Amino acid sequence: MIMLKTQRRIAAELLKCGENRIWIDPERIEDVAAAITREDIKRLIHDGVIKKKPIKGQSRARARAFQEARKKGRHRGPGSKKGKKTARMGKKEVWMMTIRALRKELRKLKAEGKLDAHTYRRLYIRAKGGQFKNKRQLYMFMQEHGILKE
């Protein structure tokens, strides 16, 4: 086997890539071995005897397959979850969703005339204080205290 270490190094410098990315035509190895100057190497590059191999990318095929499976609901069980409960949806976002739902419900009841302004305000403040986890609890509180006008 002919040693082409120097030629490979010079070609790598000229083609601005690593030595491992240099391709040398196996049928013209003698010509490459005879090339000892940079000009000789440049001529061989021009003739297509020495080429730069393309960069090997990172295949996304497995990642795409994984994403497709996740769309179908696979890999989403409790064993696949990493981090806290709040890592997926923050405490503030959960609170915002809850309070918006409660306030919307209170507005609706007030618009329908089932709550007067004073009671609406009292319930609004209780909701703000975190007394109701959800609409169900709000309605249960209103029923227990006979607030809801039918």
Swiss-Prot record:
The record's keywords, sorted A to Z, are: Ribonucleoprotein, Ribosomal protein, RNA-binding, rRNA-binding
Q: Which gene encodes it?
A: rpl19e
The record's Gene Ontology biological-process terms are: translation
Q: What is this protein called?
A: Large ribosomal subunit protein eL19
Taking the record's annotation, the residue ranges forming a coiled coil are none
Which PANTHER family does the entry mention?
60S RIBOSOMAL PROTEIN L19
**Listed GO MF terms:** large ribosomal subunit rRNA binding; RNA binding; structural constituent of ribosome
Q: How does it assemble?
A: Part of the 50S ribosomal subunit.
Compositionally biased region (Basic residues)? 71-89
Where is the region Disordered?
56-89
**Similarity-based family:** Belongs to the eukaryotic ribosomal protein eL19 family.
Cite the InterPro entries for this sequence.
60S_ribosomal_eL19_sf (IPR035970), Ribosomal_eL19 (IPR039547), Ribosomal_eL19_CS (IPR023638), Ribosomal_eL19_dom (IPR000196), Ribosomal_eL19_dom1 (IPR015972)
Listed under GO cellular component are:
cytosolic large ribosomal subunit
This molecule's function is given as: Binds to the 23S rRNA.
